[in-house]
Amino acid sequence: MRDETAEQPAPLRSGLTTGSCATATSLAAARLLLGGVVADAVQIVLPKGKQVQMRLEFCRLTKDGAEAGTIKDAGDDPDVTHGALLYSRVQLMAEPGIRFIAGKGVGTVTRPGLVLPVGEPAINPVPRKMISDHLTLLAEETGYRGGFEVTVNVEGGEALALKTMNPRLGILGGLSILGTSGIVRPFSCAAYIASIHQGIDVAKTNGFLHIAACTGNASEDTMRRVYNLPEIALIEMGDFVGAVLKHLRKVPVDKLSLCGGFGKISKLAAGHMDLHSRHSSIDLPQLAEWAAAIGADDTLQQAIRGANTSQQALAIASAAGVALGDEVCRHALEFARSVVPAQVQVEVFAIDRQGGIVGHAGAFV
């Protein structure tokens, strides 16, 4: 019998951004209008020069222009738009230039603070440049002197957008057309981190200088209850506390409230910037040391070290009258203050699974 060895996991597959999809479909539709070419695939150049070919679902003339569509393939990334049909409609204009329109399922900017002005379709700068560059080159190749009106659509985009940060950012009516490299890196979470940064930018631009960064729904509810903060001031950071703290170096606010489950706050207290279990773990011996610093005896410390979960460790300490929640928040506060600018006032809340506050450190002046 042969020895069994663990299989090597297959490498994760990269995908292409909505910006790449919009570029490919716009180019195919424009090429049909200017050259009569009905394509089933189209090749585009990504921002760093790599050429990729994308398969088209359709490429056809319409009453007043042409349209082409492709299925968004995010590779192995758990992207909300994976498998969605993205299609672009192109009309020719007499005057040179590119005019962008938000079609079905693509949002419109309604709040200041984003990279696009209020009223603009949520087609980000890099996708706009990609589309413009490809259509400009096509015009030069065909001798066309006019311009293009490009309407980007995502089938079902209105519903998909509700699963993103767009409504909170003031991007209404659908999704954003995104991408800086044209490529989706599996589990890079780049889009999520970008939405955290945008959330801070939008809050500050709209005059909200006290923000609460929360790990999930329960912590958001706690911050609403404690401060009655509006939606725009609540930053859904998930596990990416580092994305919040580092961005505040560039875009400082007056006050930052950090709120999360006790276990995640204990990871922050230990100096972790990514609170996901893939990148950091609960350190029960460290919890025992912190408990010792505020009076836990040897028996209690041993019980904390032997706990099954951070919540159990907290319950053991609380039953003994040791305020472990506050002590963990104090260490988390110290670490957070070491990252953000000195002018940013910081406080930290730890909550239980029901949203009850089990620890707090820091007080606003």
Swiss-Prot record:
Catalytic activity field: Co-precorrin-5B + S-adenosyl-L-methionine = Co-precorrin-6A + S-adenosyl-L-homocysteine
UniProt keyword list: Cobalamin biosynthesis, Methyltransferase, S-adenosyl-L-methionine, Transferase
Top-level EC class as recorded in UniProt: transferase
InterPro entries hit by this protein: CbiD, CbiD_sf
GO biological process terms, semicolon-separated: anaerobic cobalamin biosynthetic process; methylation
GO molecular function, one term: cobalt-precorrin-5B C1-methyltransferase activity
UniProt keyword annotation of Kinase present: no
Record-linked HAMAP family: CbiD (MF_00787)
Family of the protein in this entry: Belongs to the CbiD family.
Name listed for the protein in its UniProt record: Cobalt-precorrin-5B C(1)-methyltransferase
Classification of source organism: Bacteria, Pseudomonadati, Pseudomonadota, Gammaproteobacteria, Pseudomonadales
Gene that produces this protein: cbiD
